[in-house]
Amino acid sequence: MFHSLNVEDYESNPYYKNIKIKDAEIGRWNLKNEIFKPYEAFVFNDLKKMNDGRIIPQIGFFTSEFKFPAVLEDNREWMLVTPNEVETMKKAIDKASGKILTYGLGLGYYAYMISEKEDVTSVTIVEKDKNVIALFEKYILPQFNNRDKIRIINEDAFIYAENYVQKENYNFIYTDIWHDTYDGIDMYLKMKEYESLSPDSKYMYWIEDTMLCYIE
């Protein structure tokens, strides 16, 4: 399923409008802007499961150049803010309220978008890589309007989930620590096991609908 996308629809997104990315490097990590060329195809949104059982990939393209921020690890794209991230996080942004925990920092897209919500009181981010945190704190976090809501914890997500999450009474917990379904399914299933430690929290997971297409 192909989608012809409008550049202006995404450039008007608050993150794209307000967060300006400059090239930077810390350790093995590089912060930079990448480009989709006109008519270059890319993954756009979760897999779509049809009524007849078919599973259809959703592919997007722009008719003009589109610039997006990225973090590369050893020159491999690892963390991006493309239309795919924008679309696949919409539901988790809409559902977030109160005291939020998110596993995985990336470029701070999810943290930024929910920090802009009046009904979100705090955003705790658990990230295991110190260099990713350093890039974010130096170049991105200072641009947040509500950075006073943000708390970053340098820890492995699974260690935090097993040992600390039950002490905090989070209202909403969002997990985004995988690159795609290839590395994500096992981590998704493992993280689901920890839900019982904070039973009053609402849980959501990045690209969960896509992963369920492979699991079910």
Model-predicted segments: where are they?
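The AdoMet/dcAdoMet-binding core of the Class I SAM-like
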Residues: M1-G27, N84-K95, K99-E216
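Class I S-adenosylmethionine
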Residues: M1-S97
